[in-house]
Structures are given as C-alpha cells and as structure tokens.
Amino acid sequence: MTSEQFPWLTGIILLPILAALPIPLIPDKDGRTVRWYSLFVGLADFALMVYAFWQHFDRSEAGLQMVEKISWVPQIGLNWSLAVDGLSMPLVLLTGLVTTLAILASWNINVKPKLFHFLLLLLYGAQIAVFTAQDMMLFFLVWELELVPVYLLISIWGGPKRQYAATKFILYTALASLFILVAGLALAFSGDSFSFDLTELGLKDYSLWLELLAYAGFLIAFGVKLSIFPLHTWLPDAHGEANAPGSMLLAGILLKMGGYALIRFNVQLLPEAHIRFAPVLAVLGIVNIIYGALNAFAQDNLKRKIAYSSISHMGFVLLGIAAYNSLGLNGALLQMLSHGLIAAALFFLAGVAYERTHTLQIPQISGLAKQMPITFALFTVTAMASLALPGMSGFVSELTVFLGFTDSVYSSGFRTVTILLAAVGLVLTPMYLLSMLRRIFYGTYNIQLGQVLADAKPRELFVAFCLLVPTLAIGFYPKLTTQVYDVTTTALAAQVQSNLPVVALAQQGSLYSQMPAAEEATAVSMTAPPVID
C-alpha cells in the first residue's frame, strides 16, 4: 500500500465493527434508536464500498487491486493483508446490500435489540473480511469470527428448536475450520520459505501429494459452508429455526463464502490438484442438484423447503467450478450472486408470511392470495427467478454453467451424462416451487389464521424490491455483473488449463478428450494474480 493510497478496504471492514462497540451504551429502551443507528451504519458502509469500487476498481485488470498490506503479528508472520479482484468485489457488494436489507428486515425485533444489532454489525465486517483477506491466517481468523454472531443469532432469536440448530451449526462449521488451519499451515511450511501470503503461496511448487491432501482439507471445510452433500445437514435445521434476517444472511452470504473459498484456494492455489478432483466436484454437484430438489418436495416446513432448494442450486456452482473453463467459472460466480439475491428474497418473504400466520407449516396455510395479494405477487416473481425463468438472473447463471460444462474438456460421454442429470434438476425445481405457491396462496383460506391478514408494508415492499430489481436487471443484461470478473475468470481458467495436458497424460486421457484446446492453453500461464500497489 503506497502512502498516497487510502485504506478503503480496512475502512469498509472496520466501520461496522467499530460502530457496533458503542451500541450497549446507547440509551434505548424499545430498540428504536438502535435500529436507526444500525441502519445508518449499514447504509454508510454500503455507500463507502460503492464509492471506493467505482473510483478505484479497474475491471480490465485480472489481478489484485486496492492492495493493503501491513505487518500485524510479525512473530508468526501474520499480516493485515487485504485486496479485491473480479472474484471478490461483486461478493463484497452483495454482502453490503443483503446485510443492510437484513437490518431493515429486523425492524420488529424487540427481544434484546441492542445485542441483535451488535451481532449484525459485527457479522457485517467479518463477512467482508473473508472476501478480501489475502493472508491465510487472517482468512482463518475472520472465517472463525463470523461463526459466533451466527450461532448467537440462531440460538437467541430462533424457533423452538433453536438450541439444537445453533449447536449443530457451530459443531459442523468449527470442526470443519480445523481443516483450513491444518491445510493452510502445511502449505505455509512447505518449501524453503515460510509465508501465509496467498500470492506467495500461489508461487510455491508443491508435491502432488501435498496438493491433493490440502485440496481435500479445503474441500471438506468449504464444502460444509457451501452445503455439499453429505456435509449439508446443518443447513435445513439452521434455516428452519433462524428468523428471517438470519436466514437472509445464511443463504445470501454465508453459503457464498464456501463457493468463493473453493475458487480462491482450491482452484487458484492448487490447480493441478483441482484438475484431479474436478470430476468429483461434478459428481457432487449432480448429487446436490437432484438430492436437494427431491428433499424440497418432501418438506412441509416453508423455510426448510427453501433451504433444500438452496442446496440444489449450489450444485450448479460446483458444476461451474468443475468445468475447467472461464465460462464455467463465470456461471458459478453468477449463480452465487443470483442465488444470494433470490434466496434472501425468498426467506424474507417467508418471514413476512410467518409474521401474519405465525406458522411455517405449509398444510396449515392456504388461500393467502386474496388476503395478501402484494405478498403473493412478490413471492411469485421470486419463485420464478428461483426456477430460472428466462429474463431472470437464475436463468442466465444456470444456462452459463450448462454451456461452460458442455464446452469443457471432459470426454463426450461424461459430459452428456452430467448434463442430462443436471437437467433433471431443472425439471424438478419448477415442480416443487409451483406446488409451494399453489398450496400457500390458492385454495380455501384457513380461517384459523385470522379474519384479516395485513399485506406487505412499505418497509417490506422496499426490501423485496431492492432484492428483485437487481435480479431482473442481471437477467435482462448479464453484462452488468460479468464485465466485472470476465478478465479474472479468463486468467484463472488459463492457469488451470495449463496443467491439463500433464494430468491427462498421467491419467491416460480417460476423462479428457478435447486436448487441443487444453494444449493451446499451455501458452498462457498465471501462477499467481499480479499485485497492484
């Protein structure tokens, strides 16, 4: 970081964290002052990141930008090292938008409002730090930091089984985090030099066995967060018990941390191991797509149904990452952004319905369309986006993943079977989502829910619109987002493809048939992203 450069990323991370500290001292009995204070901080931080990226981020540059690096704990080689590139910058903006809207969605929280908003702001900063950290140990620390607020948000403000869901969440994620630490230390100590810096780790020459073991460790850790089968079982319980703002953050941001980390660590740091593991990712992606969709059918709890839908949609992220090419990576990243908006909207609207009906059991809810026509319209549009209706962001992202995998270097048989099985998910998704809409909003109204149910309020309309407008905008003009990371994903795909001929030769070309494209890629090599000071 040069002396002339303002530490924008540090400011974006520390603003919500430091602003959370005085919340316990704010004189406020009913939580009104704390709500407005928290909302102001969220908006200010979101505005700060929009301004910083607008002024200082160059989308034509593939490498790291806005780099900040300060020695923090030199005794252990820990640096406060931050940067963004095309992979992380869109996810930082997604974090700012969804977290700010989650603050607005929590307006009716009256139980311990000071603690609630303190945790939201702490989580806000920790999530941004995960997407911007460029030091392995710093990444591990902020990855762990976000676990505590999420645990408390579920255990204090969740449903009847909140303690079970929160404990399951913390056990899964905390134990999985140990794999990050062990794999990170193994890479840091490898070779003649010791370093936690991700750029330096990307330049090291690892033995194949070390790469494979580190890749497996990272895959387990990030697979838990991404809810890869069979590491997913914490997610339906967490969503089923968390309140609406908590579910918005779980689905909108936390799942994306797993997908982002898979690309940043498994693909970028360990490209040769990724080539050997990628077929496994493709198979796991198919399992996620079909397993999640089938389980969504079986759920009578509205939020658990949406949770299994999220598991299914994350399968497309795995397929995109497994495709070896820039189109697949583009699709994976676009799917993360799209799902972050759509899932946050679905869980928010589920919370709107719950506040009126006081139940999440779909058999107890029917005929809400006449009582809540605006909510019905919003729910319908969001469900259409989730089932990948053309004109919505979900359609573009899933189509891009399909095209990327179709153009991959796998054998024609493997590609054909994978695409056909993934298409099953495209058939199942509208079936369970349209069935959900029919059961909730059509039929005879259940009078036990009350004589009259209030429709969505202006505040709730605003939250829904802020999530749906970018969903529609990306669907009609995907370049709004893809132009941000096209250069980065192209360079990253070239780095992976440069290892394809060697691996294919070692495996006798059993899965890899389109070798001319891979051999052409060997002319391009990106051992680590360039750094801009």
Swiss-Prot record:
It is a multi-pass membrane protein. The keyword Membrane applies. The chain crosses the membrane at residues 6-26, 37-57, 87-107, 113-133, 137-157, 169-189, 209-229, 243-263, 277-297, 311-331, 332-352, 376-396, 417-437, 461-481. It catalyses: a plastoquinone + NADH + (n+1) H(+)(in) = a plastoquinol + NAD(+) + n H(+)(out); a plastoquinone + NADPH + (n+1) H(+)(in) = a plastoquinol + NADP(+) + n H(+)(out). Its main location: membrane. InterPro entries: NADH_Q_OxRdtase_chain4, NADH_Q_OxRdtase_chainM/4, NADH_UbQ_OxRdtase, ND/Mrp_TM. It comes from the Bacteria. NDH-1 shuttles electrons from NAD(P)H, via FMN and iron-sulfur (Fe-S) centers, to quinones in the respiratory chain. The immediate electron acceptor for the enzyme in this species is believed to be plastoquinone. Couples the redox reaction to proton translocation (for every two electrons transferred, four hydrogen ions are translocated across the cytoplasmic membrane), and thus conserves the redox energy in a proton gradient. This is NAD(P)H-quinone oxidoreductase chain 4 1. It comes from Synechococcus elongatus (strain ATCC 33912 / PCC 7942 / FACHB-805).
